[in-house]
Every structure is written in structure tokens, then in C-alpha cells.
């Protein structure tokens, strides 16, 4: 099954996709990685709008920085989302949901695969919102 137009991402409380859901203007996906706290915003149909990415010097400040980014989203609630592919860059880091379909094993077989960066979460058939790391 080819990569769908909208990639489902399941909300998992207290785990790697615990900061995703809906807000008054659409959908959001937020996380922290290395020295970056970020929130990606999408319209209600899952189309990418923009990202806010904050670099913190002290990794101990990541949770506070992420909470600050989410505080600006009115009507926020956590839950499953479905979004389109997107890509952006900041501080020489790629952020996005990127189609990496192809011969991933090097054996000539084709795999439909989408990777969330920089988190390195892989989505694939049956496209149910669950991921591999």
C-alpha cells in the first residue's frame, strides 16, 4: 500500500507521541530533541502551516521550553492526528515527516516508509498511527 496523503500518528500518553493533538486552529505535533523544543502546526485537514523551534543551551530547560510553546495554543487537547508530509530546517537539523520509501534493506525489495525527524519514528503499513523506532 503506497504512502497515504495523510499519515496517522497515534497519541501515546507519557511516551514519544504524548504531545500531539488538536487546538482551535487545527492540529499540532510537539516534542523535544537534543537541545530543541518545537511545535509543528497544521490546518484541520493536516496540511503543514509552520513550525516554532526553540534552541535551549541547557537540556534541563527543554520541558519548560516545550510547555511554553504549547501554552500559546488555545483550545488544546491531546489525541490522535493525521498530517501530510512536510520538511523544515533549523540549526542544521531537519524537522519533518519525510517519505523514505524504497529499498531500505538493500535487497531490492520496496518498502513504503515515512520517518519523523529528528525523533526517528518510522511509520508504515498498515498506516494505523503506530510507529517503529
Question: What is each stretch, according to the model?
Answer:
Residues 1-133:
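Sequence signature of WD/YWTD-type beta-propeller architectures
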